[in-house]
Amino acid sequence: GRTTTAELDSLDVILFKRSNMNFVRTSHYPPTERFLEYCDRYGIYVESETAVCFVDTYRQKNYAPGKTQDSAEFTPRYLSQCREMVKSFRSHPSILFWSIGNESVYGTNFQQCWDWVKATDKTRPVIFSYPGSVGEKKPVYDILSMHYQDVNGNLNQWNRSTHGFQGEGIPALFDEWAHPACYTYATLQEDPNIREFWGHSIERMWSGLFDAPGGLGGAIWGYVDETFMLPEPKVGTAFWKEFARTAKPEDYQGKCVGYGEWGIVDVWRREKPEFWATKKAYSPVRLMTTEVASFLSGQRLLLPLYNRFDHTDLDEIKIRYTYKGVEKELPAPSIAPHQKGLLVIPAEAWQEGELLSICFY
């Protein structure tokens, strides 16, 4: 097995904040107690996920044969993971809801996990993926979990759908989306601008979801690169090639294994270009225009502003603007969370083609 250090737990949560992320899904490994303590301290919302995934899906060939989700023999294994998670972490205020399975087909063992969680913790919702596999059976989720919708928020997955980031009569969470380009090495070499385009797509998706009724949020897959070193070549490392959507499967042999370099930071926690694209897209303060077409020299500028904080009025932050090399500070207007208003820039000798730089901090 492998684990993190206290230093990495702290650094990871701090990097979440620096990138303007406020939500993390602990897929698919149990987090450390330290990590959740930092989430409590810094105000990160957490979806805590049991270590059960890929049951009866296309990855089944890599696991024991049979449909374990309906097998009484496997019930203790399902419940042990679920019970351990809830009993260990239920006192953390950062945890908003429990996930009882990832990208799996419904069965009675997932039903028993739902029943146990609902009897044990009546304060939190439960989520399950794939929800469409439940069909008309007894529900095992309060929130619709959808993975990898298009940029407009549309997806049909196992007969459950979203349109414009909205579920059908149920809140929708896209708790796996916006996978960075990492598998198509040849294409990335030909056109590195694909990574720049990824930044435009995440900004478009987040802006669309933020205003969608019932659209709760999204979780980028993933935060950190999934690559790690083994002390020596081990029997079975070829298993990783089963998941490698790459033109060079030989890269998955030997000491270096993992699913791929899919993070917005690398394994040393160095920020990649995707980190800065995320920071920009998830900015909690959004100027609704980047160009002022109509203005009068010597008059104030009125700029539309969107407060995308969940709990913070904009008058709690500071504003600094620079025009013609002169930097000035400005008190922020009072705009309630999730509301729009106006930013008033005092009169200047405005001229066409000049740059006005505004910093919110």
PLM feature segments, named:
Residues G1, T50, K328-P331:
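Short hydrophobic alpha-helix segments
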Residues E7, P76, R269-K272:
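Alpha-helix N-cap/helix-start motif at coil-to-helix transitions, marked by capping-box chemistry
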Residues S10-L15, S19, F23-I264:
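Substrate-binding/catalytic cleft of secreted carbohydrate-active enzymes
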Residues S207-Y361:
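Carbohydrate-binding surfaces of carbohydrate-active enzymes
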Residues G1-E7:
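Active-site-adjacent "gating/activation" loops or surface patches in catalytic cores
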